[in-house]
A protein has these predicted regions:
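Carbohydrate-binding surfaces of carbohydrate-active enzymes
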Residues: 1-293
Length: 293
């Protein structure tokens, strides 16, 4: 929720004379329109830092696995760089298919991870599903201990690979654990991702053409915020989203106005249609109960 106006011309000494950063001053021809843009981002920043985001899926980062292959003078292409690119492609695919997840750092798990019942806890968040990407060949001993305890309590682990190392050393115990279907749900990294594994009753999207849609959802005391963004600069995105709630409102980030937004209600669920122009966005508030006015 922070926008950084990158680069400022403090002087034109040295190499700076070859750079052409914008001048954020009345001298710029777009200055009179700049307030409208910054108000949009200010309202959006407030909205997307209010309430809390509560995702049920935790995707572990393969950081320690990549470090096993890292060498300063490695030729290109090299294994550690490829692993990073593959992992980025994996989580981007999840985002483009509207999977709600958080990323888990093993270093953070070391000090803030625990298991409570069938929930994998990290700080103030708790997860019912933990995902190990195909690039995860190693796990820290502390992470492996948490995963064993999580599985014993009935937690769901989805593994796209079989980690064979614990703290960088080959581990028969780890291989046996991740190969046990009673403890771990195996997913074939060579096959298309089965997104039904990540389905949640809280929210469901149709399949918008082109996979250009991204969304962000935050829980509030009396409802939830839903932000939709079209990442394409040339194509519109249209579709519907169904989520829990009884009434919807549009939060206009351009004008600051709040007004009703049409939705089809069935019981305690709303189906909302969206039509976003290229690079367009939509910020909605979905109330748990009907409200007047």
């Amino acid at each position: 929720n922070f926008m950084n106006q990158h680069i400022a011309p403090l002087s034109i000494a040295g190499a700076r004379k070859y750079d052409y950063p914008p001048a954020f001053t009345p001298h710029s021809p777009w200055w009179e329109y700049y307030r409208e843009l910054t108000l949009h981002f200010a309202r959006l920043s407030l909205a997307l830092s209010s309430g809390g985001q509560y995702n049920d899926v935790l995707v572990l980062e393969p950081t320690t696995s990549i470090w096993m292959y890292y060498t300063y003078n490695a030729p290109r292409p090299n294994r550690w760089r490829t692993m990073g690119e593959e992992f980025q492609a994996f989580i981007t695919a999840l985002e483009r298919h509207q999977v709600e997840f958080d990323l888990g750092s093993e270093n953070i798990l070391l000090n803030h991870g625990s298991v409570k019942g069938d929930r994998f806890v990290v700080g103030k968040r708790a997860y019912g599903t933990v995902v190990l990407p195909a690039q995860m060949e190693n796990v820290d001993a502390a992470t492996f201990d948490l995963l064993e305890r999580f599985a014993a309590k009935g937690g769901r682990i989805i593994a796209y690979g079989t980690p064979q190392y614990v703290d960088g050393a080959r581990s028969a115990e780890a291989e046996a654990f991740f190969a046990d279907p009673a403890k771990v749900t195996r997913a074939d990294a060579g096959e298309p991702i089965d997104y039904s594994l990540f389905a949640t009753p809280e929210i469901a999207f149709d399949a918008p053409e082109g996979n250009y849609l991204f969304h962000h959802r935050r829980r509030m005391d009396d409802g939830q915020l839903l932000f939709l963004a079209n990442s394409s600069l040339t194509r519109p995105v249209r579709g519907t989203v169904t989520l829990q709630g009884r009434q919807a409102a549009l939060l206009d980030t351009r004008t600051g106005e709040i007004r009703g937004y049409e939705a089809q209600r069935e019981g305690d669920r709303l189906t909302i249609a969206y039509d976003l122009h290229p690079a367009g966005s939509l910020l909605l508030y979905v109330f748990d109960e009907e409200r007047e006015g």
